[in-house]
Amino acid sequence: SGMTNHGKVLKMAPRGKFGEKVDALGLAKVAGVDYIARLAPTNPARVARTVRRAIMVAREVGHSYIQAYTSCNIEYSIPTPDVMKDAFEIEKERYGFEEIISPAAKAYLDEVEKKPKKKKSD
């Protein structure tokens, strides 16, 4: 995994992870991706908003990339009830929410998001 620390011994890397982390956000930025986000699943509304924004930009402006941290409770032997606790800790330590938005994508999102939302009719 590109998010696993160098040297970490895991089932998928029994001798320790030999490669350094890949700066996927940096690669996306250099590649000119229009909407880039990093997030952990600690805030469901933010996850939904981020995915919605990425899809809208991909449909109308250009490429989107989301890097989402998910606790691998099997690989790291995290008990299922502690998965969200792990996600909050990782988010605080090194995986805070970040968005990188191109000027074209920002203009599009500003325009779309200022429109009044349609109400569902019963």
Regions found by a protein language model. Give the residues of each.
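Acidic, Ser/Thr-rich peripheral helices and adjacent loops at domain boundaries
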Residues: 2-22, 83-100
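Glycine/aspartate-rich loop-and-adjacent alpha/beta segment that forms the canonical ThDP
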Residues: 50-122
